[in-house]
Amino acid sequence: MATTTVPEFFRQFPMRQVRAADLDAALGDGAAPLDILFLWGHDCPNCDVAKRAILAAAARFRWPEVRWLHGNVYEEPELGTRFGLHGVPAFIVFAGTRKLGRISPWPGSDAFVEAIERQIAQHAA
């Protein structure tokens, strides 16, 4: 049984994988003004919908101010517990270690891009 219908996703849209134990250090390293943590799971059709949408217009989801991180909540259930998830995908937005917000479920490309660009503008102000 396949674990995803989008096996090429992380090769075509690179993100740093994080473990629950290392998340705070990654968020606090100052590598980018904002981080998006993509929480997903194997055999998750809604995660695959989001992955396909991101790949279909990858340039829209790349911002110089943003670093993407990802974690599989089935392999790292502590990530789901920490953020009180009831489903995936979920996208958590951070400025350093400060959580700015969560996008869940996948709202579609336009709404997602609009929400992130709003956070970028607010963070720059």
List the predicted regions and their residue ranges.
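Typically the conserved alpha-helix immediately C-terminal to a functionally engaged Cys/Sec
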Residues: 48-60
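Non-catalytic, surface beta->alpha helical segment in thiol-disulfide oxidoreductase systems
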Residues: 87, 92-125
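The canonical Cys-X-X-Cys-His
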Residues: 44-47, 91
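Thiol-based oxidoreductase modules, predominantly thioredoxin-like and allied folds used
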Residues: 17, 39, 63-78
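A short glycine-leucine-enriched loop at secondary-structure breakpoints
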Residues: 82-86
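Short pre-active-site segment immediately N-terminal to redox-active cysteine/selenocysteine motifs
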Residues: 40-43, 87
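N-terminal leader/targeting and pre-domain segments
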Residues: 1-34, 115-125
